[in-house]
Amino acid sequence: MSPNTWVIEMPTQKTRSHPYPRRISPYRPPVLNRDAFSRDAPPMPARNHDHPVFEDIRTILSVLKASGLMPIYEQVSDYEVGPPTKTNEFYSFFVRGVVHALTIFNVYSLFTPISAQLFFSYRETDNVNQWIELLLCILTYTLTVFVCAHNTTSMLRIMNEILQLDEEVRRQFGANLSQNFGFLVKFLVGITACQAYIIVLKIYAVQGEITPTSYILLAFYGIQNGLTATYIVFASALLRIVYIRFHFINQLLNGYTYGQQHRRKEGGARARRQRGDVNPNVNPALMEHFPEDSLFIYRMHNKLLRIYKGINDCCNLILVSFLGYSFYTVTTNCYNLFVQITGKGMVSPNILQWCFAWLCLHVSLLALLSRSCGLTTTEANATSQILARVYAKSKEYQNIIDKFLTKSIKQEVQFTAYGFFAIDNSTLFKIFSAVTTYLVILIQFKQLEDSKVEDPVPEQT
């Protein structure tokens, strides 16, 4: 046995009649409509849908599969997915090959006068900013394609671990973890609308006839931005899936805390029902179930931490690139707004709409990513805090708690961008602080450029 492993001794007077027993829920009487925290044993086993966890995100999965960013996996069973077939693997390989070919073509176009008509500005600084922004978009999406192709096996392993974990929850408690991913469709529609609107604005801003090369560059530019944003939404959805499962075990553990057990003794549950509080998730559990549930919670927590870190490992390079690209895009568009508002010439409605569309897209994505990472990290680190409040009325329970707190549960976890910085609820504030600093630098360059135009050097005679 590894020196880092530990064993919790179960009470000898209790025996299991079934390897995966289902107890009547201690939270509330049996009902037909159960939520994620009910442990009622259903009268008849219900048949699950294919991929019960990922059924709610099938739309975004279909988009990523069609674009080659996700493997077209095969369904082995309700709780297991298998590797893609040779045909599906060849399709993904072909799509990625087309993407890399277009990337090389677009990078070549950026370094030649072919793409000059796509840049509209009044100053040289503006042209440089737009050129760098377009190059960062291409590099971000190319890196996303490379990383997704490299992490195909890891992503399938993460999906299988989530499915197996849900299977264990269903066998142990008869519970289906409820989840609502309606925001995914809204984000997909918003991303598509923003990209289409931005491309239309760009076409109308070009003076003269647009060349076929510019059309290709614009179309691929929109597709790259859209798919990169879609992958960020997918990563946020995975984190929300993990958050729901962390929340489940924390609510299960919260029923054993001193406060909840004290309420049970004083008849707090009856008083809450009289006040109309029907929330079943805070009702205390019977302490006699704590040794059994503690083993399940510890095992599930370790699996969730492994999934959490696996998602971070699969996405960290993509996140670094995307955050850098978003930072630069937000900064340049804020700068363009400043130039339009403070300029002496006529304000261009086209540029204003362009800037607002970009800001809405990137700020919403940054907010979604920061919130998803922050919620999941907070819930993962809350387990040890809840465990410290468990009502340990006997030495047996206290030993279990001590063993929990001396292991990895007490170590805080972070979702990082390749280890450079943590992504949480404060990330958006940090990004806007950096945007403000860089915006001041750009404004100083603009003022320097304006001063050179207003004060020309006199010719020497």
Curated annotation (Swiss-Prot):
Listed transmembrane segments: 101-121, 128-148, 181-201, 215-235, 318-338, 349-369, 415-435
InterPro entries: 7TM_chemorcpt (IPR013604)
Gene disruption: observed consequences: Impairs avoiding N,N-Diethyl-meta-toluamide (DEET). Leads to high male courtship toward males and mated females. Also leads to diminished aggression level of males.
Subcellular location: Cell membrane
Residue ranges that the UniProt entry lists as topological domain Cytoplasmic: 1-100, 149-180, 236-317, 370-414
Similarity remark: Belongs to the insect chemoreceptor superfamily. Gustatory receptor (GR) family. Gr21a subfamily.
Protein name: Gustatory and pheromone receptor 32a
UniProt organism field: Drosophila melanogaster
